[in-house]
Amino acid sequence: MKIVLAYSGGLDTSIILKWLKETYRAEVIAFTADIGQGEEVEEAREKALRTGASKAIALDLKEEFVRDFVFPMMRAGAVYEGYYLLGTSIARPLIAKHLVRIAEEEGAEAIAHGATGKGNDQVRFELTAYALKPDIKVIAPWREWSFQGRKEMIAYAEAHGIPVPVTQEKPYSMDANLLHISYEGGVLEDPWAEPPKGMFRMTQDPEEAPDAPEYVEVEFFEGDPVAVNGERLSPAALLQRLNEIGGRHGVGRVDIVENRFVGMKSRGVYETPGGTILYHARRAVESLTLDREVLHQRDMLSPKYAELVYYGFWYAPEREALQAYFDHVARSVTGVARLKLYKGNVYVVGRKAPKSLYRQDLVSFDEAGGYDQKDAEGFIKIQALRLRVRALVEREGHGA
């Protein structure tokens, strides 16, 4: 049997690699995706080979990640439950897509992942896998093995020659990519406890951020960001640049309790500096270029799209149908937003667009601009008709 494993290089997936070989008598191919997590991917590849993988594949997927997954999601204005910009959720279908592709190319019968049986990631990986290859076998060791805790896993690692880090384990789990870093579990499981001050990696503590604000301009073309401060950049380079700018000003920290797809609530702490800047910049340009009813309709549909991404339905027909709508709407989003960053805050201070629907002559108190204020009286009376009828009916009812 041949299995392709999503391999991070950490202790858990190294244990899984050995466990798969023993339990399934299988040849294991390790696949590591570089999506900007900041870890040495080549080291992970070499470690996989030392741990027993027959082959180790490492791919730089940063550009594909941002171009084909993050930017389409951003065109939809997707935010889960009002705060979460979906940094972990959007990475899983990309990883699973390549797991399936490699399995097909290598003639593997199964894929495997290291997601636990309590979280969302198991669903995201597997929904993608089954959507792309309905007959694929998916192995989820956390749902199968008998380890009762961390001590048993470490004992297994030591018995099988898997290096165990000598540094003290972090009191929380962490997942990173080019869009964000997430922190969960451990000391964060108490929703009343403030996150440890030294936990954050992408962002400066807002209290210690520079005392002078920094201005940044983001240019959009047909829905996607293309330049920062006048410099055109590739999708991954643009997001990285905004991460650096936003990070030094403490932008993009979020601490929430969210509803997992599997039914439980969990606390997540996130850093999304570049994504937060892009969210505000996009809305600033949209305020000029989108028709009122289109904007309102888009905002009604965005939460459903965000839910689909969060749950793992990236390759579902309903997500693809919504994407076609959002892509059509985004074609008019061309312009520039100017933002001021200061101690964790993002302030929109300017916006412009070549096809702006904002007409200064219409809103000016000094110019008529073709708008006859007398017309407002009839407009108001028509809008008030149903309200007046309701009031009259209620009054007659009371009189009876």
UniProtKB/Swiss-Prot annotation:
Q: Provide the alphabetized UniProt keywords.
A: Amino-acid biosynthesis, Arginine biosynthesis, ATP-binding, Cytoplasm, Ligase, Nucleotide-binding
Its primary localisation, in coarse terms, equals: cytoplasm
Q: Where in the cell is it found?
A: Cytoplasm
| Family membership noted in the UniProt record | Belongs to the argininosuccinate synthase family. Type 1 subfamily.
The record's GO CC annotations read: cytoplasm
Positions that bind L-aspartate: 116, 120-121
Gene Ontology terms: biological process: argininosuccinate metabolic process; L-arginine biosynthetic process; urea cycle
Superkingdom of origin:
Bacteria
- What is any Pfam family matched here? Arginosuc_syn_C
The disulfide bridges present are none
Record pathway? Amino-acid biosynthesis; L-arginine biosynthesis; L-arginine from L-ornithine and carbamoyl phosphate: step 2/3
Task: Kindly indicate whether the keyword Ligase belongs to this entry.
Answer: yes
Q: Which InterPro entries match?
A: Arginosuc_syn_C (IPR048268), Arginosuc_syn_N (IPR048267), Arginosuc_synth (IPR001518), Arginosuc_synth_CS (IPR018223), Arginosuc_synth_type_1_subfam (IPR023434), AS_cat/multimer_dom_body (IPR024074), Rossmann-like_a/b/a_fold (IPR014729)
Q: Which organism is it from?
A: Thermus thermophilus (strain ATCC 27634 / DSM 579 / HB8)
Subunit notes for this chain?
Homotetramer.
Catalytic activity, EC: 6.3.4.5
Q: Where does L-citrulline bind?
A: 84, 89, 120, 124, 173, 182, 258, 270
Protein name according to UniProt: Argininosuccinate synthase
Catalytic activities: L-citrulline + L-aspartate + ATP = 2-(N(omega)-L-arginino)succinate + AMP + diphosphate + H(+)
Provide the residue positions that the database annotates as binding ATP. Answer: 6-14, 33, 114
Which CDD domains is this protein grouped with? Answer: ASS (cd01999)
Q: Name one GO molecular function term.
A: argininosuccinate synthase activity
